[in-house]
């Protein structure tokens, strides 16, 4: 069993997120909302497919793909991006490419 299976992960801190969203042209209201949310993330394996769930009080986002394969994802501000998720030890690497600039997010994952 992989180290992440059967666990959920809660975001504890986010650095530079407001500046990043501002650079993407996200408005002030959505930036304030995004900065106020600490989502819980879970990755569920079903056969060869993985579902990446991001759970927050305002909405739940689900994206499914084969592991380390590109998939379509809708961001909080409604943009469609191409994403790839991989693990490096206990870090989840979530890369997004869209009409603006690419984004890579590394998250340390101590389970809750």
From Swiss-Prot:
GO BP annotations listed: fatty acid transport
A cellular component annotation (GO) from this entry: cytosol
Alphabetized GO MF terms: fatty acid binding
Keywords, sorted A to Z: Lipid-binding, Transport
Coiled coil: none
Membership in a protein family: Belongs to the calycin superfamily. Fatty-acid binding protein (FABP) family.
Protein name: Probable fatty acid-binding protein
Organism: Anopheles gambiae
